[in-house]
Amino acid sequence: MGTGNARLAPTGRQLCTMVSLLGLMALGMQTAQAATVFDAPDTTYKGEINAQGPRGTAITAGSEVQLQGRDFKPGQRITLMRGNTVLNTDAYVADEKGTFNASLKVPADAAVGLQPILVAVSNPSAAAVFPLKVSPVVPVSNTEAYKQVSAKLAPGLYQSAVSAKTGAVFVTSAVGRPPVKASELLKLNGETLAVEARVTPAAAPGTDDGSVFAVYGVGVDDQNGNVWVTNTRQNAVAVYRQADLSLVKQFNPGTVAHARDVVIDPTLGRAFASATGTPVIAMFDTKTLAEPTPIQIKSLKWGSQFSVASLHLDAAAHKLYAVSLSTEEAAVVDAKTGTVEKVIPVEGIKMAMGVAYDAKTNRLFVAAQGSDNLAIVDLASGKTLHRVSTGAGPLNVAFDPVKRLAYVTNRVSGTLSVVDPDGKLVANLPDGTFPNHVTVDGKGNVYAVNKAKGQDDAEGDRITRFTPVK
């Protein structure tokens, strides 16, 4: 779920209600003898443009952008504009398949953020506005303040979780798109990062393609000695024994739609799993392992749906926090009753993914991959206090209550940003290829996992323990 590229597709109000404006712009580019400006429009326009930085990296000021167009009509001519400035002197022309490939240079003085690019299409005519994300370049800094120890594990590392009782670290891995045939749950020694146990999930039912119940999200239940995982591809969750990773229960496919995160309240005996892309959090009983009860979150935005992404649990206060991937909101849930206490707008973000919480300041930390920033929200007032540019593609965030610092994985930048509760960037640490997830052990140690770019990538598929020097 990285953000090294951007899908530039017209949606809703971005579509061509701007035909009159385009007609006026076209007058400056046509001769007096040109054809009618208001020609027949493309009533079934579906064109999309995908933009990607060099070799899959972030799009930044001065970088060369690779464009891939699709779903245009053969022969359509595409001109890109920023304001009144034409970005491609010669129009791109869709081939017989309705596609085109091109490159575009981002100006060296381009401001960071979502740049509104106008897509002017002719033959037949259409228009759309799309956001081209220009990511910040945040230099590595203050690396001497942290000791780093890394270990290469399995391909496709996804998440990790730490047992407060034993110090063991549990890591999930899954490789590729369906059918996913390679996936593991690993148990590590928290000190040495040595693998103490590992297991491959059971084969997925109803298929003969070799796919398994691939594991993605992970949460630790120290009260019952279990570890919970999400089976995103099968819309399910599973429970394993911490001691030897033997399977306790595999829930049926369809139990939790696109299950992502899972967190445990050991005192209440409840597990919560996010149904990504829906407004639902599934609530389980960790003793009976019965079918879950759904918690529905309603968006404050009229006509919009809260889309649950990551979860964070404050076990001491029995409060559950969730962020919405689609509506720039966060929700507070009472874990005791399973009811939503409030939904709060988060200003200045797009595509929120990660969430963490600081009980001392009552502040929520929201990592947003669509806007390349970390938002810090005061839950008492509901105000967004700070927005910190951390790098390209912030994906997850964890807050360490010992050193009182938030840690953000920037998937495309390949860094781990360290931010204090007041929005100050304390450090920006190298974290290999595609950092995916970060967690803390409550003792000052931080564990981050990343994914490799390929089989020969020495910097990927690693877990790294970051420990403050002082």
What are these regions (language model features)?
Residues A35-K470:
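Predominantly soluble domains enriched in secretory-pathway, periplasmic, or organellar proteins
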